[in-house]
A protein has these predicted regions:
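Short, surface-exposed patches at the edges or C-terminal ends of soluble domains, predominantly
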Residues: 1-184
Length: 184
């Protein structure tokens, strides 16, 4: 009897798992403030896209320690745009420092330049050239969001501060709207 119950339970678990595995569009954002959900207004602009839209993130592998946790947050949000774009949005993530040709194109064609950031630890202090930029491209039109557009620094006490994303969905959608309107 126990053996039959265990076998039936396993078969049911496997069956449910296979059934749920086919449901790829089920997405639930349980974060505080729904930081990975895209608003209806953003979805409206994404539905206006007729040609492929490129969202390219330029992020350095080596950056300031306070900036590092923001990179995955931006990448996750950009992935949400790709999903909401229903095949009309192509995303790329590039570290220009690792590829000289890509860095040259970013600098010359799009005006994307690294930001010098001071990093220090217990034993040394150094300047790191870091990329934290988003390129929105539509046809021949493009818009670049840089460090100043995406990041907000908040004071915490006299000497401490916090670096957070300002309002990334608004900034990305505003840039998409701008390139869509300029393209027309």
């Amino acid at each position: 009897v126990w053996r039959s119950v265990v076998v039936l339970a396993l078969v049911n678990i496997i069956g449910v798992n296979l059934w749920l595995g086919q449901i790829t569009s089920l997405r639930i954002d349980t974060t505080q403030g729904k930081q990975y959900s895209i608003s209806a207004a953003t979805r409206q602009y994404l539905n206006q896209i007729e040609e492929p839209l490129l969202i390219r993130g330029y992020f350095s592998g080596k950056t300031h320690p306070m900036l590092s946790p923001l990179v995955p947050q931006m990448k996750d949000l950009i992935h949400e745009y790709e999903i909401a774009g229903k095949g009309k949005i192509r995303i790329e993530f590039i570290d220009p420092i690792t590829n000289l040709e890509v860095e040259e194109e970013a600098n010359q064609k799009y005006g994307v330049r690294p930001i010098p950031l001071q990093v220090a630890d217990r034993y040394q202090s150094a300047i790191v050239n870091s990329y934290f930029h988003i390129l929105i491209g539509y046809g021949e039109e493009f818009e670049v969001l840089d460090f100043q557009d995406l990041i907000e620094t908040r004071a915490q006490g006299d000497k401490d501060f916090e670096i957070v994303l300002r309002n990334p969905e608004y900034d990305l959608t505003r840039s998409i709207k701008k390139v869509l309107n300029t393209y027309r």
